[in-house]
Structures are given as structure tokens and as C-alpha cells.
């Protein structure tokens, strides 16, 4: 028995535990339900249904309450149109109370309280449906309000085959109803416009949205027994819109369908607004008949825009396009800034390089003094010219007729070659003449042409005599430029630099010094190293200071002395015209000598002697202080001579010192005899001379006039050539005597400009008559200024006063003396 009991207890253990767990689960479920229902309270709502027209109560109307998209309670009205429904209500929640009856439009209202009332009553007013006009065609069925073809009326159209008729019904028994609403008062007869999304209606989130209706329609199709006919095909809806709707053509308005099972409007697509004449219509294709509305969600931002007459799609399109345009404009601005920045970065090195190239243009402007440099006047004297026929006709200094320096050199080279070949053999005073050559010092001393010109001086008289015969054969072609002149062709300075340099004759040369130049500057010790770093000092050395080894071997001393005394070699940096002109003139002069030599010798001698290499140039004189003083005096005389040739320009009446703080050791103070002679025109050489250089012009002889008539003036520029005439010694000697002081008489041979016995060499039409000089004058000038005679005088034991040249004595005179008598 005990075992049986124990076994029974053991066997009954599991069923007891199972029952216990079941009871606990049920108790938990009850507790959970009690907790869930703790917030809800039960109470009863009285619903009264009336007809909207005469406010008579409607009996047998179906009443239903919806909350949380589900039916909370339902009932039917009695004869008085009243129904009492009890619900479990949670304070603060929304519920929908609806009433439905056949032949009337379903109506519903939202209801909500925050405090539990003791009694609540809701009244609904149903609007009777309006019978519609039904037109049956073979293919379609139309439902209208009013007569067919009338405007501004709603209509519904569907396919005839889409209607599912009962077996006991025919098309002749079909009836329809069509009710529309477009105003706020009419909208109250339709169910409350509370919408939701399709996902919420199918059991999703319970979010309701308040709608703003534009138009609503209720359309139904009934059979003969009163049952509703369903359709299986699409239905076309067209509703007229009121003018105050604010919609525009092609605007899109959402379509909402009323669902009786949940009591809310469900979104079912999008309708389109179209215009027919002056009337707007909302068109939509629905899947079935029933309650449809064109409404806009009030919570959406698109509602306000659509109500103001702006399409929501167009609004968004314009908004997006505006954003895109702003972004595009921003990108363009950034791109322009990037291009501008890159352009500045790329052009900045070029601008710096351009500034480095044009830095020389600002150098002449640093010295703003009004003093005149005689070296510049000497080197630039070939730029000024006077016409032989008419002295009033002037030519400008700048040759602006040529677009570039290369064109000027090409045209100048051809013309100068032809003119020189024609005029050199025909000059009657060319026996004892030697050209005054001016070129770069390094180029002059190193060029083979210059050596060749001095080397052939021994036979120059024979060639000149042979040239008097008038035999004129075509001259040989000039040889190519020697190596020292090759850099002249490749000059890289721009034309604007030449224009600027020629426009400022007082400017210092800005090119760097070249190898082989003579550099001398009396005040270089007082200057800083950087002051003349970019300036090239210039030294002018007369020809009789230099000796050629070839002259000692080939020519006699008499001819060498006469040749060296007849001219001087000027070494300067010609910065007004391109150096090609000097190189071409050197070749032309040497070519002329070679041509006259070929008239008396064979072609082999002409090639061997005319263009052969000769000895180099030597300067036996030591450039000490006394020599430089004598050289300075000769340069002063040469300067005054050039100033006389440049008589077309008014000479400055004073010398001024540079204002930029630089010292000038060459400043001179002298006077001008303003009472010298009864002459109407003054040809003062300079303020330093103190003499009157007006002299009586000697008439031309018949031989000179005939030779002058044969030569025509040319408009091309050539270097200045000075010729000394042997036959005019008496004329020069007769003018040395005069009523001048010894100092003035020393200037007479240098300033003698009255001789016009030489034929003019055309240099822009300038006469060569004023440039002639007698041999006696040259010998007298050399006797006064030659360093050889100074050395002889020193060896003879002369006193210190005899060692000084007249120019040195003149420098020791009192300063700033005016009108001394």
C-alpha cells in the first residue's frame, strides 16, 4: 500500500506541475490584459442620425465606431434614428463615428475628449445620393449629371464588358447614383477627410493624416434587385474644380479612396488637373466605383504651394534647378579664380625676365643733369647732317622709317656700298687724306680690316693718283665680316632700346665692357664700385699716338707722319646706331683702297696686299698725367670741331653738374666774347673755347665746283671722313696770324672751318667743305699737342712752362671771367 501510494505520488507529480504552469500562464495573461485595460474606461455614446434635407430621423441606419483602424462598436438606429453604443475609451484618443444607409452618402465625424464624460451624444446628417444619367453604348457606359454634352459637369466612364451583372439582371435594369462635392459645405456631407497610407491600412503604423479636400465624388451602380454591381476594369473619373481652388494646369493632386471597413481615406494614386476652355477638371483613373476625393495632406508642405496655384512637381523641379544653377555658378567662379591664379603664377617669371631685359632703359634716366658730354657728341656726331643744297632742310636723328634694326642695316649696307664705291675714286682731295674711323675699341684693334687699312698706307698715294684718271670698274665684293665683328650681327637689344638711347644723347652707355677696350676715367677713385658697374667708360685716342708695325716696314716716315696727322682714331661705344654701320664703313673704305690698288697691279697683288694681314697696333706713349692732359686738350679741340660741324643746333650757354651726387671732373668755366666782331651769326665752338670761330668762307675753285656737280647728295648716313688738302697750306698759314692771342691762335688750326676746297661727301646731304684741313694746320697742331715733341722738349732741358701745352695753360686761367678787355 505504501509503495503504491508513493508510486502514485511520484506518478502524479508531473501532471500537477503542468497544471500549475498552465494556471500561472493564464494568470499572467489576465494580469497583462488588466494592465492593458487599466488606461481605458468604458462608457456609452448615443448616436443620432438625421436626413440632411428636412432633418428627419433616419431609421435602420448602420452606425459604427472606429478607433485605431479597427471597429470598436457597431449598431443600428431605431425609429427615432438613435443608437447607443458602449465602448472602452482611452482619454485623449481619436475615434470615428460613421452612419451608413442605402440611398444616402456615408457620413462620419471624428470624436475626442480629454475627460471622461458622464453622458455623450453624436449627431450625423446624411445627404441623399443624387440619381445620375446612365448612357449605355456598345463599348462603354457613361454616368452623368444632367444632359449629355453639358459643360462643367462630372462624368464617369468605363467599359461595358467590365460590369459584372447578376444572372437575373440585364443592362436595362441598371441604375446609378452620382454625388459630387466641391465646396466646404458640400464636403461636410462626405465622410471625414482623415487619410492614411496603404501600409497603415493593412495593419502597419496607425498614423492618421488630416486632408484638405479639393473635390469629392460618390458613384454607385445598382442592378434591378437593388444590389450593387462591381466592376472589373478601370473607371475614368472627371470632376470640375471650383475657381477658388488655386490649381493650375498640369498640376498633380493625390487621389484618395474611402474604405468603409476602416472608416478612413486611403491614398490610391495621383490625379491630373487639365483645362477645357475656361474650366479646370481633375481627371483620374480608378480601379473601381465608390467614394473618391482629390485632397492634399495638410501636414505636407506641398499643400500650401498647390493651394496657391503652384504645381508641386514643378515647384520641386524649379527648386532643384535653382540649386543646380547655384552650384554651377559657384563652380564657374572657382574655375575662373583658379585660371587667374595660374595665369599670374605663370606670367610672374616672364615679367621678371622682361624687367631684367629692359632694366637698361632706366639707366639713362638716373643722370638728370643738363651738362653735355663731349664724348657723346663725338660719337654721335654722325647722326646730325645738313643738306648741301639747302642748309635749312633738316633730317631727324631717329631713323624710324625702318621697322627693325635688321631692315635698317640691310638697306643701309647696300646703299653705302654703292655710294662709297662711286665717290671714293672721284675725290680730288684724296691724295693725302685718311678716313676718321670710329668703332668699338675692341673691334677696331682686333679686326683684320683695320690692320689692313693701316698696312696699305705706304702705297696710298700711288693708288690715289691712279684713281684720278676716272677709270671706274665694278669694285670687288666686300669680304665677310671678321670674327671680331660677328657679335655685332647678333645684337640682342630690342629696337625700343635703340629708340630710347637715341632719344637721350646725354645718357651713359649701359652695356658691359667688352674685352680689349681702352678704359680711362679720371675720377674712378672717387666713385664706388657699383656706380659705373653697368656703364662703359670711353677713351678717345688720336691716331698719332698709335704706331703700326706694318707702317714702319712698308711705308716711309713722311707718308706715315702725314697719314697719321691727317686724322685720328676715335674709340667709343656708339650707342645711337647699331654697330653694323661702323663695320660696313670699315669694309667699304678698305674695299676702295683695294680697288685703286688693283688698277695698277695684278689681281694676285690685289688679293695679297689689299686683304692681307699686317702688324698689330702699338701705343708707345705712357699714359701718365702729362700725357693725359695733352690728350684731354686734343679731345677738347676735337670736340669743338665737332660742335662746329653740328652748328645747326644751338650750343648750351652753361655747363651744369649732375644733380644725383656724382662728381664731374670735367666741368669747365670760361667766358664768351660777346663783343667780337660785327657778325650777325655766332658759331661759338663751346663755352670753354672763348674764341669766335666765324671765318671767311673761301670760294670753290672751278675744279672743285665741277667735281661737286658730278656728285649728288645721298640721303644715307655714313661715318664722318676728314680730308686734309696739301695745296691749301698757304691759306691755313695766312689765317694763323690774325689779331688773336697765343692761346686763341693755338685754336685756329683746330677750329678752322672756312676751307671748302674739298668736295662734299654725302652724309644725309651734309657738306664736307667745313671738314677739310691743311697740312700745315695739322703739323702745327701736332707740334703743339704731340707727345713726341713734349719728350724732345724735355730732353732739351726746357723749363716747366714750356712743357705745358696751350690747353694746360688755358686751364690755369682765372675762372668765371666775363668780357675781359
UniProtKB/Swiss-Prot annotation:
It is found in: Membrane. It is a single-pass type I membrane protein. It comes from the Eukaryota. Residues 411-512, 550-613, 727-821 are annotated as: Disordered. Residues 787-799 have a biased composition (Acidic residues). Residues 499-512 have a biased composition (Polar residues). Residues 800-814 have a biased composition (Basic and acidic residues). Glycans are attached at residues 68, 205, 225. Residues 32-317 are extracellular. Residues 473-485 have a biased composition (Pro residues). Keywords: Glycoprotein, Membrane, Signal, Transmembrane, Transmembrane helix. This is Protein FAM171A2. It comes from Xenopus laevis (African clawed frog).
